[in-house]
Amino acid sequence: MSLLDKKISTWFMRQAGRYLPEYLKISKEMTFFQMCESPEIASEITLQPIKRFDLDAAIVFSDILVLPRALGCNIDIKKSTGPVIERINNPNWLTYDAFEEKISPTLNTIAITRKSLPQNKSLIGFAGGPWTVALYIIEGGWDKTFLRTKEFINKRYHEFKEIISILTDATIQYLNKQLKHGADFIQIFESFAWAASSNEFKEFIVEPTRRIVSSIDVPVIGFPKGAGVSYLQYVKETSVDVISTDHSLPLDWIADNLQTHAVVQGNLDPYLLAFNKKEALLQTERIVDAFSEKNFIFNLGHGIYKETPLSSVEAVLDFIRARN
């Protein structure tokens, strides 16, 4: 059964992660990339939320920074500070020399997971959107202003465009390899969509995403986080099959403007799930009421937080199953 076949399908962004005690037990002994690069371990982590919550889809345990790492970027993820990235200053620094070797663990994780995952569960592969990955590697991490990238775009436009082109081509290769190894859905995480001007959004988010979607033969979920009203342009011009919505968008606006173009995914505020179970349940009911005229995928407006109580996740799932 596909995610698209149920009245309400459910999975959570970052569902395999630090809110799960079984994940913490493994992560105490290994770094993040050690876990990602150990296919048996990564597959075990991928399956943990399925075994605990019986969700409708697993998403491979990996990271959007696996791709730029495979293109030669020096990247690490620290438990205390997050991504530590050696900034790139030239598109020529991106190389395919170790590409196959570096993506191999994720592909093997997908293959192992598909064999263990029940056939009625979907397996989601993913990548970061080229814009988001470019911002990470030019900035050397996350920055609330992205001044370095904006300077790069305005002073070295053609080189930035080349970086986006390289990342787009690599993403297409990477995602198609994920499909060959057993993924049956793809999500594109455009986490920094909010940082793009309207012109940048069109050229560096919409156009690359359209190219990626047209090159993939399974349903694609697009997530242009923080894009606001530009969500409509994104869903109309990229041809994504599913539009994943963040929790800043009004439910009636989503239903009126987006649900006519694609299956809606979202959009419970992960802060509510972490800190206010009562309100999380009320908002879950509002979401179900808003979107239930058509099939939709219940998810969060962003990744689940490590502080999230398991009881809150279980309560939300119980409510949704009662309405399915």
Swiss-Prot record:
It holds the Pfam family URO-D. Transmembrane segments: none annotated. Pathway: Porphyrin-containing compound metabolism; protoporphyrin-IX biosynthesis; coproporphyrinogen-III from 5-aminolevulinate: step 4/4. Its EC number is 4.1.1.37. One of its GO terms (biological process) is protoporphyrinogen IX biosynthetic process. One of its GO terms (cellular component) is cytosol. Substrate binds at R14, Q15, A16, G17, R18, F32, D63, Y136, S191, H302. It catalyses: uroporphyrinogen III + 4 H(+) = coproporphyrinogen III + 4 CO2. Keywords: Cytoplasm, Decarboxylase, Lyase, Porphyrin biosynthesis. Gene3D superfamilies: 3.20.20.210. The record marks D63 as: Transition state stabilizer. GO terms for molecular function: uroporphyrinogen decarboxylase activity. Its main location: cytoplasm. It is found in: Cytoplasm. SUPFAM superfamilies: UROD/MetE-like. PANTHER family: METHYLTETRAHYDROFOLATE:HOMOCYSTEINE METHYLTRANSFERASE RELATED, UROPORPHYRINOGEN DECARBOXYLASE. Homodimer. Belongs to the uroporphyrinogen decarboxylase family. HAMAP family: URO_D. Catalyzes the decarboxylation of four acetate groups of uroporphyrinogen-III to yield coproporphyrinogen-III. This is Uroporphyrinogen decarboxylase. It comes from Neorickettsia sennetsu (strain ATCC VR-367 / Miyayama) (Ehrlichia sennetsu).
